Amino acid sequence: MKILLLGEYSNVHATLAEGLRALGQDVVLASEGDNWKNYPRDIDLFRESNSTWCGIKTYLKIKTLMPQFENYDVVQIINPVFLPLKAERHYEFYHQLRRNNGKLFLGAFGMDYYWVKAGLDCKTFRYSDFNIGSQVRHREDNDIWIHDWLEGPKGELNRYIADDCDGIVAGLYEYYAGYKPYFPQKLTYIPFPIRKCAEAENPKTGEKIKFFIGIQRSRSSYKGTDIMLRALERVESKYPDACEIVRVENVPFEEYKRLMNDSDVILDQLYSYTPAMNALEAMARGLVVVGGGEPENYEILHENELRPIVNVEPNEESVFNQLCNLIEHRKDIPCMKKQSQLYIARHHDHIKVAQQYLDFWKSKALR
């Protein structure tokens, strides 16, 4: 099968491409590398800045590349906004992809109209990036996302593509829950793909427990990293001889992985029900995740045995108490590390996941 993957979020498409190639598929990945993270790709769509001039150059570059994006059996776009262009500019390229290829699939892997809408209804989720119970989280960054996706052209584009495409793949429970009321027939859930980490066959814990926290300055409040860091600093003050904090800010993915490899515990995404790509990458390396591990996460995977994730409620005290509990029961950490790796092997192995994609794409091709 000839497959085109367009766009990138958190290494999802790059890892999926590896799995598909391992299964003998012909895959091309075109993306801008998810900005400064610089994930691998075959065709580079990187945009240097948000200036108008740079936008014109990027538009012309993509227009020139479009003949290379024809005659594929399957095209999958990472998001409705799958190119480094304004939403209004996408229709031209989307229609070309539809005309000149086989089936087209939409990824529900990140910020989009249906995810924002589900968070704001204060019913779909007990808590999310956009709500705590019945209260909407009004923060500057949240308000920008709400404006962009619910009130602006991004939302219009999202609704158009979701209605027009051949299928929708959700990579997390939250995204699945956002789309399910509207597209139950064309929607499926497939776990994010993760490569097995050969250098982490037997993860060990040193004298101090190393707590890893990745910080995106522009999204710290939105993702709850600021709250998690405050709780972690309190733990460090309480147990100075038992723990160490590894802080990482806005580094490329390869450097991020290197710094993560020597850690024991990762703190990630306070408002999530589920572990996303960074947490899953950490689990493959034998780290224990403190973050989203709600029952819905295990239910959608049909996982009735493993519980490797330290689930926290979206507040500082919950994070603090769970971190203290980890330190006071550090003897359990080696077992939790092994469970993390088994969880990844069972549900997220990139070759198994790639086969699930092939099965879904083929099921739609037969209709």
Tell me what each language-model feature is.
Residues 39-41, 106-151, 218, 301-302:
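Acceptor-binding helix/loop patch of EC 2.4 sugar-transfer enzymes
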Residues 63, 69-70, 93-99, 129-167:
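Membrane-proximal helix-turn-helix segments that form the acceptor-binding/catalytic region
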Residues 188-223, 229:
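Conserved donor-binding/catalytic core segment of Leloir-type glycosyltransferases
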Residues 261-274, 287:
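Acidic donor-binding loop of glycosyltransferase active sites
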Residues 331-362:
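A charged, aromatic-enriched C-terminal amphipathic alpha-helix characteristic of glycosyltransferases
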